[in-house]
Design a protein with these regions (language model features):
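Non-heme Fe(II)/2-oxoglutarate
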Residues: 1-82
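Conserved double-stranded beta-helix
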Residues: 71-118
C-alpha cells in the first residue's frame, strides 16, 4: 500500500479498453439525454441519471453492466497490488464536464479499497 493511501497502477486497463469504455459511456449518456429531452420515460436504475448530489447535472450511473464487467477485470490486479482478498461491491461511473469538481468526501465503508479509472 502506498504512503498517501493511494497508488497509481499504470497499464491496469489497456488504452484500447479504456477508450472503448469511454466512448460507450459517452454514447449511452447522449442516448439517455435524448430520451430525457424528449420526455421518454426510462428507468434511471438501468440507464443512469443527472441527479447525483455530489455533482448535480452530470451524468452518472450506478452498476452499469460494462462497469461491473470492468470491476471484475481489475479485481485480480487490485488483489495483487494490495495483497488483500477483495470482494467486489459495486461500480459507479460519471462523465465529468468542464467546471465539475468532486470535492473531498467520505465514502461508505464498502469503498475502503477502491479503483478509479482516469
Amino acid at each position: 500500500m502506498a504512503f498517501n493511501k493511494y497508488q497509481i497502477i499504470k497499464g491496469a486497463v489497456s488504452y484500447e479498453l479504456a477508450n472503448f469504455i469511454f466512448n460507450y459511456f459517452l454514447l449511452k449518456r447522449d442516448a439517455v439525454k435524448w430520451m430525457y429531452d424528449n420526455n421518454i420515460t426510462y428507468d434511471t436504475g438501468m440507464l443512469g441519471t443527472w441527479t447525483d448530489d455530489q455533482i448535480p447535472n452530470t451524468y452518472s450511473h450506478y452498476a452499469d453492466p460494462v462497469m461491473e464487467t470492468l470491476l471484475m477485470k481489475v479485481l485480480p490486479v487490485m488483489a495483487q497490488e494490495t495483497g488483500l482478498q477483495l470482494v467486489p461491491t459495486y461500480s459507479y461511473a460519471r462523465i465529468y464536464k468542464n467546471g465539475d469538481a468532486l470535492h473531498r468526501h467520505k465514502d461508505r465503508p464498502s469503498c475502503e479499497i477502491s479503483t478509479t479509472v482516469n
